[in-house]
Amino acid sequence: MDDLSFDAATTLRPRADGSTFDLDIHPLWTVGDKPNGGFLLALLGRAAAQALGADTGGAWDVQSATVTYLAAPALEGAEIHTTLLRRGRTASHVRAVLVQSERTLVDAVLVLGALTPGTAPRYNDNAPLRIPDPDQCVR
């Protein structure tokens, strides 16, 4: 694992079934000695998108996620199991579970859809919030 990029750290190795992925939890993406929760969610999101894309032949992006962090995984190999819960024309639901030593550690349900190519997320258009001077704030 010499490549320190996020893309390299979130690389998944799909199994023949197309719904299970092997991975290594990169030690760079940690808080102390535990993997960062956002990093783990990114792994689950990539697995869900890859499983759905392999199943439908399309490109899918995570739109929302509900995640339960049951325990922190060790910095070693793990696997992600995905299950298609609902397939739609514009949005699909996938469950992704991170497992290590046959123990479920992170469980997520993700909603995926296709983003319009070349469009920026809507939050980029928002003006910065006006924050009052500290002496005008309620204490």
Model-based region annotation:
Residues 1-139:
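Terminal targeting signals and extreme-terminal segments of soluble enzymes
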